[in-house]
Curated annotation (Swiss-Prot):
GO terms for cellular component: plastid; ribonucleoprotein complex; ribosome. Pfam families: Ribosomal_S8. This is Small ribosomal subunit protein uS8c. Belongs to the universal ribosomal protein uS8 family. Keywords: Plastid, Ribonucleoprotein, Ribosomal protein, RNA-binding, rRNA-binding. One of the primary rRNA binding proteins, it binds directly to 16S rRNA central domain where it helps coordinate assembly of the platform of the 30S subunit. GO terms for molecular function: rRNA binding; structural constituent of ribosome. It is found in: Plastid. Part of the 30S ribosomal subunit.
Length: 136
């Protein structure tokens, strides 16, 4: 079992995207649970189910389809981990990046919990920059 469950969840999500899987099972942790809530809020998945105290099942992943030329706002192409256990990345509210001219988003861990960069900018709070999602 890996020590960094969040990185493991992102890797499983990336691998599912590469093979166009609609369902992925990620390890359960409080961070991954909050992360799956954000994916639901951003309409990047349709349903999540807690399988046991160890796993969360994410269903109905929406991703970019290479065969069609259509890209919708809620289809994502790539997710990338920014802050790592060996190299934490903290930013102020004014330094929160815009990803793909506002089409992508970042996820921050703040004192108010996990939230997207847009929400953190609105509340004027910074935090640890966990990951980013690209749509282009």
């Amino acid at each position: 079992m890996p020590r960094d469950l969040f990185s493991d969840a992102l890797t499983r999500l990336r691998n599912a995207l590469r093979v166009n899987k609609q369902t992925v099972i990620i390890p359960f942790s409080n961070l991954n649970y909050s992360f799956s809530n954000i994916l639901l809020e951003e309409h990047l998945l349709e349903k999540k189910t807690i399988l046991s105290k160890k796993y969360i099942k994410l269903e109905g992943l929406k991703f970019y389809n290479k065969k069609s030329d259509h890209t919708l706002f809620n289809f994502f192409k790539n997710c990338q981990r920014l802050s790592k256990p060996s190299n934490r990345l903290y930013i102020k509210a004014g330094d929160i990046p815009l990803i793909d001219n506002g089409l992508g988003f970042v996820i921050l861990s703040t004192s108010y919990g996990l939230m997207t960069g847009k929400k953190a900018r609105a509340l004027n709070i910074g935090g640890e920059l966990l990951c980013q999602f690209n749509f282009q």
